């Protein structure tokens, strides 16, 4: 066998090297040292950045949430049992992104954009948005000027919400917080059905953070029944999902909502609820060995909510005039709104709707305490017809609450005070409203106009709900034309004639 000379070997190697045309990929690769409770400790990710997405050998993704000289702490978004000690980890060079677009409407997805409803893969997305982005600046915004109708009389009349506002829904468990958010989503159907273009519609996102799977299923079922699923995205994380996924959920959903906002459309997002989100972040921070502060929350727990809620905005006309309205939900313990997380979120938002368990158990639903609830910017978005009625309502209810305190102690009241007390009781009855029965603005104005008029003084307090149902039925059947022009034209006197006529015949 003849030997091969070294010159020939060098020649062959030189030819191979010169003809090599394959792509060369340079990257930072590390090795998993340990995995525990959704946190992986990785060695060797040189040049990696804080918040950068990494890919494990199993395909699971994670985000770098802690950096030391040679060690990185990675939060795993998925099942940590799929990540093993010794697995390779590769930096992607990108921040966390989620799919966005119209194809997500009507679907139930995870915070990573994966379908959870069993209806197959999601195709035709309009791209991807980063989960963490800077909130719009001062010059990128404009004042809230358009109303967002909830269909709930107490809110639309007394605590109005505008497009681009952040309105907190706060109260004890089982007081109807989610019910208010769902009614608001369902009420958008009447406006979306008659919208002239896509830019006139209000798209909705419901974010379930650490909720029971049965509760999420009930919400999805109700949205489908009401025909609201077509314009709604449900981003779901159950109580059994990993803590990092629960933490990621509101940011991912906000990125999906920003697609509509940045394209000149309107979006409503419900965070249900941020109390569980704060607990998930506390758990994650303790696992990352960050120093605990008050109630064992880390020092930046305020910042995680402020940077999320500041992304809700009404953009300037130069940027398309789109809006993202946020309805965060906070659960209190025994009505204590002075606790750490509630006070944080109250200070970030533009107002709060406060629900009381005492009112709920008395049968006043929605159980909104009008005295403690406030909307700091929404009144600028109210239409004229609503403002006229709402102004007198606020005064009547304030006088009623003051007189009620006197009456409770058995104080003698004169005839005018007694009449005011009776009027307040009737007004309170008219503010009651069943769940999943939102009213149009015209219907709300008609009911509240009746409540402020003396024509109802002869009707017993217990019959006010029946009176309201009868009045609305009559207006829908016999006076549809009057209702249609109620907001544009001054037809208040004509409407009062109809109301007084019905009150006499009731």
Curated annotation (Swiss-Prot):
It is found in: Cell inner membrane. Its EC number is 7.1.2.2. Produces ATP from ADP in the presence of a proton gradient across the membrane. The alpha chain is a regulatory subunit. F-type ATPases have 2 components, CF(1) - the catalytic core - and CF(0) - the membrane proton channel. CF(1) has five subunits: alpha(3), beta(3), gamma(1), delta(1), epsilon(1). CF(0) has three main subunits: a(1), b(2) and c(9-12). The alpha and beta chains form an alternating ring which encloses part of the gamma chain. CF(1) is attached to CF(0) by a central stalk formed by the gamma and epsilon chains, while a peripheral stalk is formed by the delta and b chains. The lineage of its organism: Bacteria, Pseudomonadati, Pseudomonadota, Alphaproteobacteria, Rickettsiales. It is an enzyme of class 7 (translocase). Pfam families: ATP-synt_ab, ATP-synt_ab_C, ATP-synt_ab_N. The record marks 373 as: Required for activity. Keywords: ATP synthesis, ATP-binding, Cell inner membrane, Cell membrane, CF(1), Hydrogen ion transport, Ion transport, Membrane, Nucleotide-binding, Translocase, Transport. This is ATP synthase subunit alpha. Gene3D superfamilies: 2.40.30.20, ATP synthase alpha/beta chain, C-terminal domain, P-loop containing nucleotide triphosphate hydrolases. GO terms for molecular function: ADP binding; ATP binding; proton-transporting ATP synthase activity, rotational mechanism. It catalyses: ATP + H2O + 4 H(+)(in) = ADP + phosphate + 5 H(+)(out). It is a peripheral membrane protein. The keyword Cytoplasm does not apply. ATP binds at residues 171-178. Its main location: membrane. InterPro entries: ATP_synth_asu-like_sf, ATP_synth_asu_C, ATP_synth_asu_C_sf, ATP_synth_F1_a_nt-bd_dom, ATP_synth_F1_asu, ATPase_a/bsu_AS, ATPase_F1/V1/A1_a/bsu_N, ATPase_F1/V1/A1_a/bsu_N_sf. The keyword Transport applies. Belongs to the ATPase alpha/beta chains family. GO terms for cellular component: plasma membrane; proton-transporting ATP synthase complex.
């Amino acid at each position: 066998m003849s030997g091969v000379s070294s010159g020939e070997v060098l020649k062959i190697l030189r030819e191979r090297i010169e003809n090599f045309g394959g792509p060369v990929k340079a990257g930072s690769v590390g090795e998993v040292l340990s995995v525990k409770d959704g946190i992986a400790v990785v060695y060797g990710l040189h040049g990696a950045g804080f918040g950068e997405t990494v890919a494990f050998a199993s395909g699971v993704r994670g985000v770098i949430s802690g950096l030391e000289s040679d060690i990185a702490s990675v939060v795993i978004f998925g099942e940590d049992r799929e990540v093993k000690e010794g697995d390779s980890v590769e930096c992607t060079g990108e921040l966390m992104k989620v799919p966005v677009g119209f194809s997500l409407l009507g679907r139930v997805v995870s915070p990573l954009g994966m379908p959870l409803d069993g209806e197959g893969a999601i195709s035709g997305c309009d791209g991807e948005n980063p989960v963490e982005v800077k909130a719009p600046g001062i010059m990128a915004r404009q004042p809230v000027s358009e109303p967002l109708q909830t269909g709930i009389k107490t809110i639309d009349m007394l605590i109005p919400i505008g497009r681009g506002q952040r309105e907190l829904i706060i109260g004890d468990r089982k007081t109807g917080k989610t019910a208010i958010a769902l009614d608001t989503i369902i009420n958008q159907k009447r406006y979306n059905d008659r919208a002239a273009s896509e830019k006139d519609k209000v798209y909705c996102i419901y974010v379930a953070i650490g909720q029971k799977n049965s509760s999420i299923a009930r919400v999805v079922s109700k949205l489908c029944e009401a025909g609201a699923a077509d314009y709604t995205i449900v981003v779901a994380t159950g109580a059994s999902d990993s803590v990092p996924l629960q933490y990621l959920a509101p940011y991912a959903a906000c990125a999906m909502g920003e697609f509509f906002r940045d394209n000149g459309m309107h979006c409503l997002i419900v965070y249900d609820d941020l109390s569980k989100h704060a607990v998930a972040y506390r758990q994650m921070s303790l696992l990352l060995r960050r120093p605990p502060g008050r109630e064992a929350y880390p020092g930046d727990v305020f910042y995680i909510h402020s940077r999320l809620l500041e992304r809700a905005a009404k953009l300037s006309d130069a940027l398309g005039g789109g809006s993202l309205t946020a309805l965060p939900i906070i659960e209190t313990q025994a009505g204590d709104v002075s606790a750490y997380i509630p006070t944080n979120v109250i200070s970030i938002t533009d107002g709060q709707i406060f629900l009381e368990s005492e009112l709920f158990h008395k049968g006043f639903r929605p159980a909104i305490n009008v005295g403690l609830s406030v909307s700091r910017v929404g009144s600028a978005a109210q239409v004229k017809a609503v403002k006229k009625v709402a102004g007198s309502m606020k005064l009547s209810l304030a006088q009623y609450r003051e007189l009620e305190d006197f009456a409770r102690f058995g104080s003698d009241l004169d005839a005018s005070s007694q009449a005011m007390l009776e009027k307040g009781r009737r007004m309170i009855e008219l503010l009651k409203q069943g769940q999943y029965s939102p009213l149009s603005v015209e219907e709300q104005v008609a009911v509240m106009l009746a409540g402020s008029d003396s024509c109802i003084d002869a009707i017993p307090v217990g019959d006010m709900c029946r009176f309201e149902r009868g009045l609305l039925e009559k207006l829908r059947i016999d006076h549809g034309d009057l209702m249609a022009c109620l907001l544009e034209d001054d037809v208040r006197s004509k409407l009062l004639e109809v109301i007084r006529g019905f009150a006499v015949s009731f």
